[in-house]
Amino acid sequence: MLSVTWDRALAILLPGMPRAMEIKDVRNAMFVLAEKWPVTYGRAFQRALAFCARAIEGKCSASRARLAFLAAAREAKVAVVA
């Protein structure tokens, strides 16, 4: 089974949050996309959800899911601060 932990954590600043949120792995990214994400539509958002799910199932790498998460952040104008 592929690892769902990222080589490097990300820190994102979501609207309305007082400080940055650290995202360390695919499961955490999936939760943030599903429960906290400010924009729940768009191609990059859908792809990020799909790649996170695939990584959790062992069907793609965590690094691929991380790239998809970063694309969703760009699409939603979510600041990546680290």
For the regions a protein language model found, what residue spans apply to each?
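Short, charged/polar N-terminal "headpieces" of proteins
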Residues: 1-12
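A short, structured beta-strand/loop element
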Residues: 13-50
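Short, compact, well-ordered microdomains
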Residues: 52-82
